């Protein structure tokens, strides 16, 4: 192969459309190679088309309602030009995923429970987005209030799992099963809150959270399909809805998902992983989300640890989360997103092979 092919613009500076094609191809290949019956292909395609089509109606409406994003002044300066881009895009693609997942799965108890948890987390995100738009600031709900609401949702979901006698065993690499007993509930609450915050932190570059979310959902769906076909349908509908959203969110984005979408993504992923007993697969698939979270935690700890008499500390990264560090290191947004898509697809393949 001619090495000069990699000097082509599609590799050096991909466009948002290039990334949409890449994402579509990755999702299609995952279904074809790892899902023997291809039963997930139809719900994937259907929700993609419906989500993309609905967005054509909702995005202009959000613009007319002046639902423009308020940008962080302490964020990358290049992002200030995005101020005014409609937000709360999660309000159209998340309901598409939930409605079609419920119908396609025939309202099984597991899917109903996960859908309700997802709706609750979407509601928390909506409140946060609405506060930001209402007061024209980027503060939204206080971190304490948001955490309290997330924990409340997690506790209610754990109570449902307890009543319905969901297994407290977790399966690790090599099909090693570990019974956690009471400690499972502590882990479950943590996973629900941590995963939703991790996807929220990942939502900082056009097409990043939605695309990596689509790959993660489809990968988790493929893993659990043999044991939980109803939840596999849920995951596939979410993957398709995310892909349809990327049609509008690809660089340059016409709409952002906001916390309305990002909190729902993480909550849904965590809930499915917990019910299906595949936390190891969830951990691998969510590797990039956790990297984003850990980069923020490490940045804060390092800054406080190196704080001098003047009250100022040193920064481990140029900016957290990690994708902002890459931006300030000279990476274009599209290059970051393309790299994250490919790495996430590899993590999904690893999770499938090890499950």
Swiss-Prot record:
InterPro entries per UniProt: Glycosyl_transferase_4, PNAcMuramoyl-5peptid_Trfase, PNAcMuramoyl-5peptid_Trfase_CS
EC number: 2.7.8.13
Keywords for this protein: Cell cycle, Cell division, Cell inner membrane, Cell membrane, Cell shape, Cell wall biogenesis/degradation, Magnesium, Membrane, Metal-binding, Peptidoglycan synthesis, Transferase, Transmembrane, Transmembrane helix
Membrane-spanning segments: 14-34, 40-60, 84-104, 107-127, 147-167, 176-196, 205-225, 227-247, 268-290, 334-354
Entry GO terms, CC: plasma membrane
Entry GO MF terms: metal ion binding; phospho-N-acetylmuramoyl-pentapeptide-transferase activity; UDP-N-acetylmuramoyl-L-alanyl-D-glutamyl-meso-2,6-diaminopimelyl-D-alanyl-D-alanine:undecaprenyl-phosphate transferase activity
Pathway(s): Cell wall biogenesis; peptidoglycan biosynthesis
Compartment list: Cell inner membrane
Reported cofactor(s): Mg(2+)
Reaction equation(s) it catalyzes: UDP-N-acetyl-alpha-D-muramoyl-L-alanyl-gamma-D-glutamyl-meso-2,6-diaminopimeloyl-D-alanyl-D-alanine + di-trans,octa-cis-undecaprenyl phosphate = di-trans,octa-cis-undecaprenyl diphospho-N-acetyl-alpha-D-muramoyl-L-alanyl-D-glutamyl-meso-2,6-diaminopimeloyl-D-alanyl-D-alanine + UMP
UniProt-listed PROSITE patterns: MRAY_1, MRAY_2
Any GO BP annotation: regulation of cell shape
Membrane-related topology note: Multi-pass membrane protein
Domain of life: Bacteria
Similarity remark: Belongs to the glycosyltransferase 4 family. MraY subfamily.
Reported function: Catalyzes the initial step of the lipid cycle reactions in the biosynthesis of the cell wall peptidoglycan: transfers peptidoglycan precursor phospho-MurNAc-pentapeptide from UDP-MurNAc-pentapeptide onto the lipid carrier undecaprenyl phosphate, yielding undecaprenyl-pyrophosphoryl-MurNAc-pentapeptide, known as lipid I.
Protein name: Phospho-N-acetylmuramoyl-pentapeptide-transferase
Organism, as annotated: Microcystis aeruginosa (strain NIES-843 / IAM M-2473)
């Amino acid at each position: 192969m001619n090495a000069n092919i990699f000097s082509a613009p599609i590799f050096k500076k991909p466009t948002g459309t290039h990334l949409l094609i890449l994402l579509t191809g990755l999702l299609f290949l995952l279904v074809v190679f790892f899902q023997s019956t291809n039963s997930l292909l139809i719900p994937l395609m259907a929700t993609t088309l419906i989500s993309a089509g609905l967005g054509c109606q909702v995005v202009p409406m959000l613009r007319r309602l002046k639902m423009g994003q308020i940008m962080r002044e302490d964020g990358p300066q290049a992002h200030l030009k995005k101020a005014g881009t409609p937000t709360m895009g999660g309000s159209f693609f998340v309901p598409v995923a939930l409605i079609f997942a419920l119908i396609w799965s025939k309202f099984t108890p597991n899917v109903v429970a996960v859908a309700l948890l997802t709706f609750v987390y979407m509601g928390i995100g909506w409140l946060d987005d609405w506060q930001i738009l209402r007061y024209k600031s980027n503060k939204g709900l206080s971190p304490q209030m948001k955490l309290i609401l997330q924990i409340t949702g997690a506790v209610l979901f754990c109570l449902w799992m307890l009543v319905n006698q969901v297994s407290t065993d977790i399966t690790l690499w090599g099909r090693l099963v570990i019974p956690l007993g009471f400690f499972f509930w502590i882990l479950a609450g943590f996973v629900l809150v941590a995963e939703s915050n991790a996807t929220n932190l990942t939502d900082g570059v056009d097409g990043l959270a939605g695309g990596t979310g689509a790959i993660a959902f489809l990968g988790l769906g493929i893993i659990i399909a043999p044991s939980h076909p109803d939840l596999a349908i849920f995951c596939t509908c979410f993957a398709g809805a995310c892909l349809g959203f990327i049609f509008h969110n690809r660089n340059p984005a016409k709409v952002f998902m906001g916390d309305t979408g990002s909190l729902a993504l993480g909550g849904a992923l965590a809930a499915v992983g917990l019910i299906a007993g595949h936390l190891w697969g969830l951990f691998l698939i969510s590797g990039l989300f956790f990297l984003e979270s850990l980069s923020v935690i490490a940045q804060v700890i390092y800054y406080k640890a190196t704080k001098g008499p003047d009250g100022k500390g040193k920064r481990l990264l140029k900016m957290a989360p990690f994708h902002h560090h890459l931006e300030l290191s000279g990476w274009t947004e599209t290059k970051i997103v393309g790299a994250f898509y490919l790495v996430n697809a590899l993590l999904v393949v690893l999770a499938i092979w090890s499950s």
